[in-house]
Amino acid sequence: MSETNHEIDSNFAGRLNILRAGVLGANDGIISIAGVVIGVASATSNIWIIFLSGFAAILAGAFSMAGGEYVSVSTQKDTEEAAVAREKLLLDQDMELAKKSLYAAYIQNGECETSAQLLTNKAFLNNPLKALVEEKYGIEYEEFTNPWHAAISSFISFFLGSLPPMLSITIFPREYRIPATVLIVGVALLLTGYTSAKLGKAPTKTAMIRNLAIGLLTMGVTFLLGQLFSI
């Protein structure tokens, strides 16, 4: 594969991972908020209590998702930057050892000895640091994920996912709130299950059924709990 094609594939894979994470974040928003509003609506018919409970859950969930994503990506970025610093130090202190290290990495990644030697020689004529970090650690050199971008994306995806259950539980009349919300959430879960399976190249039917089952179980449990504490 040419260097240009490899770069295109890497960029596409990165965008695909971001999109998949967005779909999963939206899925979390759908299930989490559906569970909260169904449970509260089962316990009380007071629309303001239902709305405030759902709104608080949206804020808590979105900030929790964003905070977790920020910490996770920041840790990953720190680890990747430390790996780059180590390889840079190796290049500065012992060029021959760095060459042997890159050659061994190519061999480990499936190249034959001749090809590994050619690739090593070529890398040290161009950008040895880039080759070292990409081959040894699988890191895209100078393409570190921004933790703020990841956090904002996670916040938005969770918020968007929370809209179907939140809107349906507040818009529909009292007698239709719960069944309408279950129906709308079910459709939304089927869509996110289908989308995540397509992005991951997995069987769509299995993913859709699994996603729907988890959502229905969540809503069923919170509905029963709401009935126990009905006011």
Model-derived segments and their meaning:
Residues 1-72:
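Internal alpha-helical transmembrane segments
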Residues 2-14, 73-155:
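Cytosol/matrix-facing amphipathic helices and coiled-coil assembly/linker segments
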Residues 14-25, 47-54, 115, 147-152, ...:
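The feature identifies polytopic integral membrane transport proteins across all domains of life
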Residues 29-34, 154-165:
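Core segments of transmembrane alpha-helices
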Residues 38-53, 166-177, 224-231:
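Helix-coil boundary and interhelical linker segments in multi-pass alpha-helical membrane proteins
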Residues 175-187:
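Structural signature of hydrophobic alpha-helical transmembrane segments
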Residues 191-216:
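Interfacial loop-to-transmembrane junctions
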